[in-house]
């Protein structure tokens, strides 16, 4: 009798995706992040579901309902802290996953890459609307500031903002619809993840060398299932250490105060994973210019495949491009730091220089380095 996993219509799909999938024999731990992101998504959906059972999306009771979850619901504190810090783990894995894609040239699988960028945008949108739900000071003012950016759009801006708010300010209607968005978006993410995997399995995985690995493939199970479980154990350990020992380390103290439209916090800033984009937004004195730079900082990922000039796919054997890649990494860390600082000197100028360097590295220096490295492979002298 033939094995059921190879004949049953549903099992066959799972078999070709996770068991008998031919995988390159040399992929490193940097290829673990896809599965880790899948686990993050499952954790977020499950903890979120249990939170939604006790949460009320009304301005008068939202803050109290979150306090009630933490105080009175069985293990509510754990579910809430896992959900909040799970988001941080999600973005940590996302940034490393994208960084891996840039370093090893995985972006040349264009469909997979583009779906991945869309996924990044949807996850960012989900995190933003989710941050508003506890209805603390930073939730309220974060929602006010970020939604207000849309008013920079010429002609329709103000109408658009009031349409999203459901009134003339962030209020009950805004909170209710943000809860609805926060509930539906993760399921849209699941659908996009399936499409992401579908396109990936059309081509097979890339590998560190950037060379076609078809001549040497091994089955995904047991080799990479075991390897993924190791990465998973590290991630779960990190998440539990964060959740159980310092659950509020990455949060903002202002969010322990209920939302008050009459009192603005001294420094309005988003969660750490948005700070790099927030720094780019703030570094441009013009409102519309800032919004466009903010969008460009993420959407620039879509044109990275078009900026690939090298004859080699990966950065593994390209020391000049490697140096620029790590400069870009340092640059993003600098932007993240600046995004959390008040708007005063010397932070303003550092932010402006870092923002300019970010675009300069991606748009000009890295493609130029690729061309130079091509020349160095076969110098004309």
From Swiss-Prot:
This protein's UniProt keywords: Electron transport, Heme, Iron, Membrane, Metal-binding, Mitochondrion, Mitochondrion inner membrane, Respiratory chain, Transmembrane, Transmembrane helix, Transport, Ubiquinone
List of residues binding a ubiquinone: 201
Binding residues for heme b b566: 97, 196
Localisation: Mitochondrion inner membrane
Cofactor(s) this protein requires: heme b
Binding site for heme b b562: 83, 182
Membrane topology: Multi-pass membrane protein
Cofactor note: Binds 2 heme b groups non-covalently.
Transmembrane portions of the chain: 33-53, 77-98, 113-133, 178-198, 226-246, 288-308, 320-340, 347-367
GO annotation, cellular component aspect: mitochondrial inner membrane; respiratory chain complex III
Gene Ontology biological process: mitochondrial electron transport, ubiquinol to cytochrome c
Gene Ontology MF: a single term: metal ion binding
Predominant localisation class: mitochondrion
Other remarks in the entry: Heme 1 (or BL or b562) is low-potential and absorbs at about 562 nm, and heme 2 (or BH or b566) is high-potential and absorbs at about 566 nm.
PANTHER family xref list: CYTOCHROME B
Oligomer and partners: The cytochrome bc1 complex contains 11 subunits: 3 respiratory subunits (MT-CYB, CYC1 and UQCRFS1), 2 core proteins (UQCRC1 and UQCRC2) and 6 low-molecular weight proteins (UQCRH/QCR6, UQCRB/QCR7, UQCRQ/QCR8, UQCR10/QCR9, UQCR11/QCR10 and a cleavage product of UQCRFS1). This cytochrome bc1 complex then forms a dimer.
Biological role stated in the UniProt entry: Component of the ubiquinol-cytochrome c reductase complex (complex III or cytochrome b-c1 complex) that is part of the mitochondrial respiratory chain. The b-c1 complex mediates electron transfer from ubiquinol to cytochrome c. Contributes to the generation of a proton gradient across the mitochondrial membrane that is then used for ATP synthesis.
Family, as annotated: Belongs to the cytochrome b family.
Name of this chain's protein: Cytochrome b
């Amino acid at each position: 009798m033939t094995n059921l996993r190879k004949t049953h219509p549903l099992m066959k799909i799972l078999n070709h995706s996770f068991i008998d999938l031919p995988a390159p024999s040399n992929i490193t731990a940097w290829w673990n992040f896809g599965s880790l992101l899948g686990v993050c998504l499952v954790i977020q959906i499950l903890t979120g579901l249990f939170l939604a059972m006790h949460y009320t999306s009304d301005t008068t009771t939202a803050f109290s309902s979150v306090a009630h979850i933490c105080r009175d619901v069985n293990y509510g504190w754990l579910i809430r802290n896992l959900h909040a810090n799970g988001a941080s783990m999600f973005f940590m894995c996302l940034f490393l996953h994208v960084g891996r894609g840039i370093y090893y040239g995985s972006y040349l699988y264009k469909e997979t890459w583009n779906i991945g960028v869309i996924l990044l945008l949807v996850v960012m949108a989900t995190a933003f609307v989710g941050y508003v739900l506890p209805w603390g000071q930073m939730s309220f003012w974060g929602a006010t500031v970020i939604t207000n950016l849309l008013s920079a759009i010429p002609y329709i801006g103000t109408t658009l903002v009031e349409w999203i708010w459901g009134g003339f300010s962030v209020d009950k209607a805004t909170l209710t619809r943000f809860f609805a968005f926060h509930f539906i978006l993760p399921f849209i993410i699941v659908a996009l993840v399936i499409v992401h995997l579908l396109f990936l399995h059309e081509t097979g995985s890339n590998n560190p060398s950037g060379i076609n690995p078809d001549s040497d493939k091994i089955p995904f199970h047991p080799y990479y299932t075991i390897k993924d479980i190791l990465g998973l154990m590290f991630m779960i350990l990190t998440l539990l250490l964060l959740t159980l020992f310092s659950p509020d380390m990455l949060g903002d103290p202002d969010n322990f105060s209920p939302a008050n439209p009459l009192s603005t916090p001294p420094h309005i800033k988003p969660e750490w994973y948005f700070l790099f984009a927030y720094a780019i937004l703030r570094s441009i004195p013009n409102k519309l210019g800032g919004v466009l730079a903010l969008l460009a900082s993420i959407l620039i990922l879509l044109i990275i495949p078009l900026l690939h000039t090298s004859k080699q796919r990966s950065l593994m054997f390209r020391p000049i491009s490697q140096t620029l890649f790590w400069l870009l990494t340092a640059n993003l860390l600098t932007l993240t730091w600046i995004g959390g600082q008040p708007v005063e000197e010397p932070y303003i100028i550092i932010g402006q220089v870092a923002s300019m360097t970010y675009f300069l590295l991606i748009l000009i220096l890295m493609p130029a380095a690729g061309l130079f490295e091509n020349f160095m492979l076969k110098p004309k002298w």
